[in-house]
From Swiss-Prot:
CDD domains attached to this UniProt entry: CYP72
Family statement: Belongs to the cytochrome P450 family.
Membrane topology: Single-pass membrane protein
UniProt cross-references to Pfam families, sorted A to Z: p450
Gene name of this polypeptide: CYP72A397
Residues noted as binding heme in the record, renumbered to the chain: C468
InterPro entries on file: Cyt_P450, Cyt_P450_CS, Cyt_P450_E_grp-I, Cyt_P450_sf, Cytochrome_P450_Monooxygen
Location(s), subcellular: Membrane
Organism listed in the record: Kalopanax septemlobus
Cofactors required: heme
Name used for this protein in its record: Cytochrome P450 72A397
Amino acid sequence: MDGVVVTYTKIAAAVAVAVVVVGWAWKVLNWVWVSPRKLEESLRKQGFRGNSYRLFYGDLKESSEMTRKAKLKPINLSDDPVLRVRPFIHQTVKKYGKSSFIWIGPTPRVQIMDPEIIKEIMVKSYKFNKPKRNPLVKLFADGLANHEGELWAKHRKLLNPAFHLERLKCMLPAMYFSCIEMVSKWDKMISKDGSRELDVWPFLQRLTSDVISHTAFGSSYEEGNIVFELQTEQAELVMKTLQSVYIPGWSYLPTKRNRKMKEIDRKTQSCLMNIINKKTKAMQAGEGSTDDILGILLESNLKEQLGQGKKNVGMSIQEVMGECKQFYFAGQETTSGLLVWTMVLLSIHPNWQARAREEVLQQFGNAKPDFDNLNHLKIVTMILYEVLRLYPPVDTLFRRVDQETTLGDITLPAGVQISLPIMILHHDQNIWGDDAKEFNPERFSEGVSKATKNQVVFFPFGWGPRICIGQNFALLEAKLALAIILQRFSFELSPSYTHAPTTVLTVQPQHGANLILHKL
């Protein structure tokens, strides 16, 4: 009898194991084959075109290889930068048209290029969340730009005061000091004949790093620079991670890349804790500002502690850390990219450089630029908008569809991703005219609304409720830096300049920006 019981027990256990294995196998099969084929069928019925689904990898292998090859050679100044920044997307749209899709592993990603549909997606940001990410990406930055729903609303509300108009005015002296420090170095480096070839890219990176360190975190460049270097290294690894299929649980495996990313994160957190502790002590002694970003974050953390973790009271220390990582990187990369492309394009178009300088000298002469008159620089603003059109900091935005959704005359099934290809839209001749690929700031002479015909076709900082919180900060810093540079130098492209726009989360010059600077 006992033997029979044991036999039945073994059979039951075997059946249970078999059920689990079959269930797991079905989930895998559904993920890598059944679901992708259903989604592809649904998209094709509605007129979307793209490559046929390839098991597991989709288009990722081809896309990664095209990106790798694109980075090996520069392009001409007149070439479309999308060719180098997003070569596979460029090829897909050229081959299949605007209503196209690509495969990110087993997930189809649809290109949306209709302004009205883009507007609806941007306005209903609560409905179209960002794609689920590999947990390792959170090591790089897990702040406001990545949050959704109530968490995003809480963080946005807490951080808004740091970017109010009066607060930006208070930041101007620190910005000015950093700019003067940079141009003073240039002045000393330039020879007696008044000219010198210089790669301005690392100087502009240091400038924006210094500004964000002082204005947002009350720390020195030396303290912040360690964080910047670590975050830059992490960004390269994040780009590689995003080019591979995410497999649940893979982030826990001790692969070389996983170990490296976690090691960088440990170092970053250690550096940030030193800055946080220093700031906390200064605030407790009544010496540190409480209305910069870090001050606001730490006051919020105090509320969290006093509220004993009650919902929406404040931020946990991990949330504070996530915001610090994000603002350190975004606050530096966005403005340095805008400035370097502005200097490159003004080197190519000396007539616009001269017009910008004339306006700056009319407003300020050789005196220190002030807040109110910086906002009256019409030509400089037109130039910055045109640079943001041609070289937006982020070239593409991504969203996901969690439930079947109708947008205009299309119905997107749950499970697909949405791509809003900013750079492609910014270069679209159907939107901007025959000169869409040319540098022409005059198109913004009557403002953004007139230039875009009130369509959502220009969104270098996003659009709608989730527009970049630091947009005005970045533009103020760029106007000030450009004004100070134009007061002191003229510049042109060096013969050694190599035009190689690439994306490392933001669009930047792969081989720097060699210019010839002339003292005025």
